[in-house]
Design a protein with these regions (language model features):
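Non-transmembrane "mature" sequence context
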Residues: 1-131
């Protein structure tokens, strides 16, 4: 069933999706990784926004983008070198939630809560404290 986001949400959705695609490019995410993180194929999301018709899953999509933005911002704060910041999600991580796997593996499970775990991990490590 399709429904439109509210005007405010719709105005936020397009720039949020653009920010997501820029981050995905910086992280060299594949189309499959982008879809897993976003919870839907990016091209479908773009088409829906262009048509002004969104489905009931859009609030979750915006929440996913919010977590990605937070993860990205935290990494930019932690690592002064852009390559280090962008590469962190692909490096094996001994932190408890990752079990030796890269953060990207957890981010790509398709579960909203796993994106939240990565964001909270960075916040909890004192790596980033949002203002």
């Amino acid at each position: 069933m399709s429904k439109s986001l509210g005007n405010d949400d719709l105005r936020l959705a397009a720039p949020a999706l653009r920010a997501f695609t820029r981050i995905a490019s910086a992280w060299s995410l594949t189309a499959h990784e982008q879809s897993a993180i976003l919870g839907r194929p990016v091209d479908v999301a773009c088409s829906q926004l262009e048509a002004g018709a969104t489905d009931s899953d859009w609030p979750e999509t915006l929440q996913r983008i919010s977590f990605v933005l937070g993860i990205y911002a935290a990494l930019q704060t932690l690592f002064p070198d852009q390559q280090q910041a962008d590469g962190w999600i692909r490096r094996p991580n001994a932190g408890a939630p990752f079990k030796g796997e890269p953060a990207l593996a957890l981010m790509c499970t398709g579960e909203l809560g796993d994106l939240e775990i990565v964001r909270e991990y960075l916040d909890g490590q004192g790596m980033y404290q949002p203002s």
